[in-house]
Amino acid sequence: MVGVGPKRPPSRKGSMSDVPQNLLEHIKHFEEIFTVDTATLKKIVDHFVNELTKGLSVEGGNIPMNVTWVLGFPDGKETGTFLALDMGGTNLRVCEITLTEEKGGFDIIQSKYRMPEELKTGEAEELWQYIVDCVEQFIQFHHENENLSKLPLGFTFSYPATQDYIDHGVLQRWTKGFDIDGVEGKDVVPPLEKVFKERGLPIKVAALINDTTGTLIASSYTDPAMKIGCIFGTGVNAAYMENAGSIPKLAHMNLPPDMPVAINCEYGAFDNEHIVLPLTKYDHIIDRDSPRPGQQAFEKMTAGLYLGEIFRLALVDILDTQPGLIFKDQDTSQLRIPYLLDSSFPAAIEEDPYENLIETAELVQNMLKIKATRSELELMRRLAELIGTRAARLSACGVAAICKKKNIESCHVGADGSVFTKYPHFKARGAQALREILDWAPSEKDKVTIHAAEDGSGVGAALIAALTLKRVKAGNTAGIRDAQAMLAMC
């Protein structure tokens, strides 16, 4: 028997040698438009810092920089049982979290429910009824025949919301493919609590949070070096602690200047004016055809919701401008379906370990009903790499901007989301971009490192509910609307 030794990573050196010249020209064009060099990254970050600062001002800016009314990090001594409701772009998750006596300890039980596509463009009342259906089902399953009382809820509502209070929030605009009439500009807590009351459920929203804020708090609970929480998933966002004295729009609250206040950046809206982002024609098409043209410019270039669509549009562009160059004499009708491909499609292509791209060929055959040639597979492989690399490098700009704004030289960043956890090479590409932007010497280790976050939308929501009840008990009711109702939950 011959020992073959350790398996080497696949090498694609020279794999373009058999690609025809006219396809190579398209590959070269894609390389030109999707590559973001160091100078461009730095220019983006400088503008990003200015936009973050502007968002904290009284006048505001493109980036909302929403005040969350989470005042400080947990100390690990929080206790109690809390419900957490996580309404993301794909799933609805209901959790029961018990913060134990052990420092930093918790127990969790949870159930996940699919968010039906028809709800995303349906009626507001249908949304709230469905959410409460899921919560009621969860309680009946885990607490059958129990007489429950006083259930504080941390509601992870991962959409831009203005919060004058931690227990209330007005939806600014839908993102992640949602477009439900009658919710934007309205407080989302009363209609939810109304349905809880109608069903006889003793649940009070103790905290309305964003998943990014939850990620920040949950991660710092287990790692005090965590200073930033990020989401790289269906959408993109970050949260961090800002000193109250550096938030002009909070000056009227007369908070101690050094009091930490968690800011939910909502920086998917960065550069909506298209000043610094290197947009391609495909980015413009995505924006034009989206439910919210002119909004979420940064998110549309980096988030998982759009990466597969960028990939699809680039291929359709070749089909339309040079008919017969690719997929000759084949039915390409599947490829022309908008949003048929999500980010898992280019991710799977990048993960194909075989030199002959056999897995990519099978994927294309199964999803698009196209039998691709080896040259076409190489084109798709390179296109997937370019789109994934651009997303990772641009994503690093948001982290770098917060570090520069706060003069953070070294820290841990807690990250979550499907792109971060599942997209191949995303972490390494983002880390490389941070090195370039922040000018670390080649001999220096990475000073700002991105790590897998704790469960922000579950444990984070419970922790923030606990922190809120804790400060109500202590008499600190800043940013709390229903303090008396909250006190009754303690």
Curated annotation (Swiss-Prot):
Pathway assigned to this chain's UniProt record: Carbohydrate metabolism; hexose metabolism; Carbohydrate degradation; glycolysis; D-glyceraldehyde 3-phosphate and glycerone phosphate from D-glucose: step 1/4
Positions of the UniProt region annotated as Hexokinase small subdomain: 75-209
Region (Hexokinase large subdomain): 210-455
Presence of the UniProt keyword Kinase in the record: yes
Disulfide bonds: none
Keywords associated with the record: Allosteric enzyme, ATP-binding, Glycolysis, Kinase, Nucleotide-binding, Transferase
Reactions listed under catalytic activity: a D-hexose + ATP = a D-hexose 6-phosphate + ADP + H(+); D-fructose + ATP = D-fructose 6-phosphate + ADP + H(+); D-glucose + ATP = D-glucose 6-phosphate + ADP + H(+)
Assembly information from the UniProt record: Monomer.
Family the UniProt entry places it in: Belongs to the hexokinase family.
Protein name (Swiss-Prot/TrEMBL): Hexokinase
Lineage of source species: Eukaryota, Fungi, Dikarya, Ascomycota, Pezizomycotina
The encoding gene: hxkA
